[in-house]
Amino acid sequence: MSNVLVLKSSILGDYSQSNGLIDHLVSSWGDSVSSVIERDLVATPIPVLDGEIAGGLRGGDTLTARQEEALALSDMLINELQNSDTIVIAAPMYNFSVPTQLKNWFDIIARAGVTFSYTENGPVGLITGKKVIVVTTRGGMHKDGPTDTMVPYLKTILGFIGLTDVEFVYGEALAMGEEMAAKGITNAKSALEKISA
């Protein structure tokens, strides 16, 4: 497993179930992990993509200071991604989608010629040979249903940059009473234990 990149995106801080599950997983790996880079996308937010930043991500000789900062940040985040063997993503469902903070991370690392390339046969992802584990928590029960729009999105954007070995772990029914919530966390931990076995 060696090098692990952890992405947290919950707005709930110490009350976050997704962060707790991610911590549980990473700690279970123990000495099998050489290094862990943890990036809390809420505590240290990525700027929202706009026209100026989008222009800066293409590079050039006449960048504004803000564009230079965004490009340097993008380069650093992509370097973290390239140097990792396993990527662990905490992705709580907010209003049927991923948190804004996680979307901002994807927006700044999805760069033509760097993390993907355009070819005559369509786009090709350039970040390959890595395992992705997504822990997604939800207040209700959405797995495999029409309201689960975030999993198709994550599969698409991850695959777009070359990350196709993706495993999802679900913590569901967390706002449906104490008994259901406890069962949801137990089920998620059981799934994570199978991954770490």
Curated annotation (Swiss-Prot):
Comment on bound cofactor: Binds 1 FMN per subunit.
Residues the entry annotates as binding FMN: 10, 16-18, 93-96, 137-140
Cofactor(s) essential for the protein: FMN
EC number(s) per entry: 1.6.5.-, 1.7.1.17
Protein keywords: Flavoprotein, FMN, NAD, Oxidoreductase
An example Gene Ontology molecular-function term: oxidoreductase activity, acting on NAD(P)H as acceptor
InterPro entries: Flavodoxin_fold, Flavoprotein-like_sf, FMN-dep_NADH:Q_OxRdtase_AzoR1, NADH:quinone_OxRdtase_FMN_depd
Annotated catalysed reactions: 2 a quinone + NADH + H(+) = 2 a 1,4-benzosemiquinone + NAD(+); N,N-dimethyl-1,4-phenylenediamine + anthranilate + 2 NAD(+) = 2-(4-dimethylaminophenyl)diazenylbenzoate + 2 NADH + 2 H(+)
Function: Quinone reductase that provides resistance to thiol-specific stress caused by electrophilic quinones.
Record family assignment: Belongs to the azoreductase type 1 family.
Quaternary structure, from the entry: Homodimer.
Protein name: FMN-dependent NADH:quinone oxidoreductase 1
The organism of origin for this protein: Photobacterium profundum (strain SS9)
Record lineage: Bacteria, Pseudomonadati, Pseudomonadota, Gammaproteobacteria, Vibrionales
